[in-house]
């Protein structure tokens, strides 16, 4: 089943940072940290950074044989481009046959030959992120993926248990998947940046401004691999530009503890967190992490995060529907559905928190799929989504190496009538052709007005930084605004990306 909904407009290594870890409460296994973030008055010039999920992308990475619903493939190809990993010519021909039968145009698909190991389905976990280097080059950031995805208890110091073991009880390594990024880079004609540490994608959420979130199992995985906590943070700072690394407690009593099944970064200052039923055994754990950890964190702009909630429900016994395990790709959000009453509510919630985006939901009943591999049937049996393994786990963006990047420090509402309503933003043209400065503007209007006013952004002293003041101070009104920019390459971009359907806003008191 596939559901699409159009969202209505609505409101939508350390130098300055050190993180202290210690074991606090074994009942919920909190590993607390002090996160010191300076008060930032404007956005920063970013010389090296790891991309966020919501940034401009060329398309989506999948693997054949498929591990996602065929209707999802159709929609991904319709919306952008599908990059399909195949092991050989036989697999490519089979995939091409089915894609053609589903009406997917050949120009919307690319095939790339890569080796496939035990974990090939989970391109999110072993697959590469995108790092933009000081010279503006995008590289595929290839973390280590040697021991697959271990599980652990809820305590941050609990031991790791490895899923794949031989009859002799030795760990079966997943080096085949670990080695797949190099041929992927060759197929995409993109350079590969080797990250000498574990960087399991489903447990790494980044904001594009040097902040990342993971659960504490990631530190344990790296320690098992021989990378200390200090080395992990130092290497991230040096190679990915992540200076502010927020490690939160594990949230499952036993599991892989991947953060994308607990929360979702919506942008630089908003976090969507799952909310279980109040009578669920994990409810108090989820709430404790939110109250004691997330609410104490600061955004890159030195402000508390806006914490939003998405209600979930049981789909099988006590297993929770993983609605945060969704994919944000350009202007569309792809959501896993679990055939429960909470599905419709989850889609509506995604609409509310992401104005202007198209939200599409996908069920994954294997009986409804035209082609299902033997391995998929053995692994999932009846239904293809699980509480710790859904849509986000099996997809990954291929970001645009020549993107027009915009990030902004939005005006914090409400403001008084004497407040200088200055908007600061970072604009980087990775195409390197240069910006059309007269078309880098702020668009603003009184809320629900018909006409947009425009103000040209002024360059700051630091490269890539811009600002402008919205000259409106009438008490009792609300103002909507968005940023737009144009590159000499012909690319244009807005922030929010769905503007003018989605905008920023503030009220004047």
Task: Tell where the protein language model's regions lie, with residue ranges.
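N-terminal secretory signal peptides that target proteins for export/translocation
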Residues: 1-10
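A detector of low-complexity, intrinsically disordered, Ser/Thr/Gly/Pro/Ala-rich segments
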Residues: 5, 14-17, 406
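Basic polycationic patches enriched in arginine
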Residues: 13, 31-33
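Bacterial N-terminal signal peptides
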Residues: 15-25
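The feature marks the mature, well-folded catalytic cores of soluble enzymes
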Residues: 34-405
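Glycan-association/targeting regions that enable binding to alpha-glucans and other polysaccharides
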Residues: 397-509
């Amino acid at each position: 089943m596939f559901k699409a909904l159009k969202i209505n407009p609505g409101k939508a290594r350390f130098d300055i940072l050190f993180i202290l870890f210690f074991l606090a409460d074994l009942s919920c296994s909190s590993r607390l940290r002090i996160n010191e973030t300076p008060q930032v008055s404007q956005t920063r010039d970013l010389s090296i950074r790891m991309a966020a999920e919501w940034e401009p992308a060329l398309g989506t990475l999948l693997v054949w044989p498929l591990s996602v619903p065929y209707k999802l493939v159709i929609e991904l190809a319709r919306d952008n481009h599908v990059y399909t990993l195949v092991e050989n010519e036989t697999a490519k021909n089979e995939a091409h046959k089915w894609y053609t039968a589903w009406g997917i145009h050949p120009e919307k698909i690319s095939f790339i030959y890569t080796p496939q190991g035990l974990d090939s389905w989970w391109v999110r976990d072993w697959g590469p992120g995108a790092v933009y280097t000081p010279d503006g080059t995008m590289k595929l950031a290839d973390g280590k993926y040697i021991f697959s995805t271990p599980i652990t208890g809820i305590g941050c110091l609990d031991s790791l248990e490895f899923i794949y073991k031989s009859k002799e009880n030795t760990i079966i390594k997943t080096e085949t998947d670990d080695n797949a990024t190099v041929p992927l880079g060759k197929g995409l004609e993109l350079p590969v940046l080797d990250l000498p540490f574990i960087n399991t994608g489903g447990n790494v959420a980044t904001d594009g401004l040097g902040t990342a979130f993971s659960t504490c199992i990631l530190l344990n995985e790296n320690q098992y691999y021989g990378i200390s906590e200090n080395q992990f943070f130092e290497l991230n700072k040096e190679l990915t530009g992540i200076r502010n690394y927020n490690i939160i407690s594990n949230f499952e009593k036993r599991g892989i503890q991947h953060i994308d099944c607990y929360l979702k970064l919506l942008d630089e200052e908003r976090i969507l967190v799952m909310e279980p039923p109040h009578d669920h055994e994990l409810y108090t754990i989820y709430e404790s992490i939110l109250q004691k950890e997330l609410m104490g964190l600061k955004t890159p702009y030195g402000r508390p995060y806006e914490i939003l909630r998405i209600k979930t429900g049981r789909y099988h016994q006590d297993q929770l529907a993983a609605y945060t395990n969704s994919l944000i790709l350009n202007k569309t959000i792809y959501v896993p559905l679990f055939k429960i009453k909470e599905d419709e509510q989850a889609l509506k919630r995604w609409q509310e928190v992401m104005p202007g985006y198209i939200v599409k939901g996908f069920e994954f009943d294997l009986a409804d799929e035209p082609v299902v591999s033997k391995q998929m049937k053995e692994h999932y049996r009846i239904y293809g989504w699980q509480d710790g393994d859904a849509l986000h786990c099996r997809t990954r963006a291929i970001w645009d190496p020549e993107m027009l990047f915009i990030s902004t420090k939005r005006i914090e509402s409400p403001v008084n009538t004497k407040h200088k309503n200055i908007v600061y933003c970072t604009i980087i043209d990775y195409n390197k052709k240069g910006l059309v400065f007269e078309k880098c503007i702020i668009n603003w209007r009184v809320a629900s007005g018909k006409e947009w006013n425009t103000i040209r952004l002024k360059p700051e002293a630091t490269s890539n930084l811009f600002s402008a003041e919205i000259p409106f101070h009438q008490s009792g009104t609300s103002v909507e605004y968005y940023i737009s920019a144009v590159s000499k390459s012909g690319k244009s971009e807005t922030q929010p990306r769905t503007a003018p359907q989605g905008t920023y806003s503030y009220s004047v008191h």
